[in-house]
C-alpha cells in the first residue's frame, strides 16, 4: 500500500529571454542534480503559498501568488510514497535570484534541460516547458 502523497511545488521562473532558472542540489542523495526551484508543502499550505515561501528561502526573491500560474503536474513513485510535483510558471518577481541553498544557479532554454542531470519527477515537465515558453 502506498502512503499519503508527498506534494511538492516547483516554479519555472522565466526571464525576458525565454530562459528557465534551474538550481543544482548541494546535499543529500540527489546532490549535483539540477532541478526547478521549489519544495514540499507544509500542512495546510497551498502550492502557491509554498512557492512564495520556498523561493524566498532558496533564491532570496519575492513572488506574489497572483504571479504564479499553475501549469502542470508530474508524479513519481518514491519508496512507499507517491510524489506529486505541481509546476507553476512565474514571469514576474522582485529581486535577483541567488543560490542561498543550492550549489549553483543556471538560466537555460527549455530545450537545454534535456542535457542536464535532473531528478526523475522533473523530466516529464521538460516537453511541457518547451511547448509553453
Q: Which residues fall in each region the model found?
A:
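Short, charged, solvent-exposed linker or helix-capping segments at domain edges/interfaces
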Residues: 97-102, 117-119
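Residue-level signal for inorganic ion chemistry
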Residues: 11, 105, 109
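Conserved N-terminal beta-strand and adjoining loop/helix that marks the start
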Residues: 1-20, 40, 73
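Charged phosphate-binding loop/patch that engages nucleotide di/tri-phosphates or the phosphate backbone
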Residues: 123-133
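C-terminal structural segments of small proteins and small subunits
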Residues: 110-119, 123
Amino acid at each position: 500500500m502506498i502512503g499519503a502523497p508527498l506534494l511538492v511545488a516547483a516554479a519555472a521562473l522565466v526571464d525576458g529571454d525565454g530562459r528557465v532558472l534551474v538550481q543544482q542540489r548541494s546535499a543529500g542523495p540527489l546532490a549535483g542534480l539540477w532541478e526547478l526551484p521549489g519544495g514540499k508543502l507544509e500542512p495546510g499550505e497551498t502550492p502557491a503559498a509554498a512557492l512564495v515561501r520556498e523561493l524566498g528561502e532558496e533564491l532570496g526573491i519575492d513572488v506574489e501568488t497572483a504571479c504564479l500560474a499553475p501549469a502542470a503536474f508530474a508524479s513519481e513513485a518514491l519508496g512507499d510514497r507517491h510524489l506529486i510535483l505541481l509546476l507553476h510558471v512565474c514571469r514576474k518577481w522582485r529581486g535577483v535570484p541567488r543560490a542561498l541553498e543550492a550549489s549553483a544557479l543556471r538560466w537555460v532554454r527549455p530545450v537545454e534541460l534535456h542535457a542536464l542531470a535532473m531528478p526523475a519527477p522533473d523530466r516529464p515537465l521538460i516537453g511541457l516547458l518547451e511547448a509553453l515558453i
